[in-house]
Structures are given as structure tokens and as C-alpha cells.
Amino acid sequence: MAPLFRRKTCLRQTRERCFFAGQNFSAIAEDVDTGKVYGLYILHPNNVGRCSHICNASYAVRQDARGLHIGEKLVQDCLVQGAAHGFGVLQFNAVVASNIHARHLYERLGFVQLGVIPKGFRMKDGSYEDICPYYHELG
């Protein structure tokens, strides 16, 4: 199975345990009958100190599960969990500008775009693409 959560380098099983254990909250979208994982997210503080009330999350959805609204359900749950864990704002630092499906979802769910960071994301081929930070105030 291809990795769900892409990083510059792949995580090995022991490093995965440490990585996920270091999050404030991690969730998976799983078919309870088959055990197949369709997506996941991680939730953690975006910063420390006087900005520690702002959280950040990262999402991954299997390519063969796109269109099933898995991402939407993960983001909705993340909004609830962020508030339940005492955060006041959920901020996405690096939404790639060409990821229009994610951007439309975030905007539909009430996220506000903060601007554009030119060439903020390095693509696999070494080129750069703009990123769009977003935020959502939590209940």
C-alpha cells in the first residue's frame, strides 16, 4: 500500500509510533468491516507560548477514496477535536494553491484564506508552487 501521509522521507514503523504519539490528537477514517484505512489527520499546536491556542492539522486521504467525502468528515471532526482540546483557532499553514478541491472544501466549511506565499511549497520535480494559509475560529 502506498503511504497515506507523505513526507520528504518515509516513516518506518518505530518512527511512526513516535510521530503519531507526539500529536495532541490523531484520527483515522477506517472501514470497520474490512479494517481498510481511507484517511487520517493529525492535530497539534501550531506554535508555543502566547500562540499556543492556535492548532494545526495535516490530512491524508487515499487516492482511491477521493470523492467519498472522507476529507470533509475528517476536517469536520478536526474542528470539533480542536475545540475539545482547548484550541481557539485551527490554522493551515501550507495549502498548495493548485489543490482546488481542498481549498473549496475549507472555504465551504468557513475557513478564511490569509493570503498567498509565493513559491512556498517544493514539488516532487523540484519546482515551487504558491501556498495559501487558512484559519478557522473554533467554538
Where are each of the predicted segments found?
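Conserved beta-strand-loop-alpha-helix junction that forms the acyl-donor binding cleft
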Residues: R66, F92-A102, G120-D125
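A secondary-structure capping/hinge motif
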Residues: Q113-G115
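Conserved G/P- and acidic residue-centered "switch" motifs that form tight phosphate/ATP-binding loops
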Residues: H69
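Conserved GNAT acetyl-CoA-binding A-motif
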Residues: G82-V95
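Acetyl-CoA-dependent GNAT
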Residues: L4-D64, V75-Q76, Q81, E137-G139
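Terminal substrate-recognition subdomain of acyl/acetyltransferases
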Residues: I117, D125-G139
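Conserved active-site tyrosine of GNAT-family acetyltransferases
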Residues: Y106, F111, Y134
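Conserved residues at the C-terminal ends of beta-strands
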Residues: H44, N93, I117
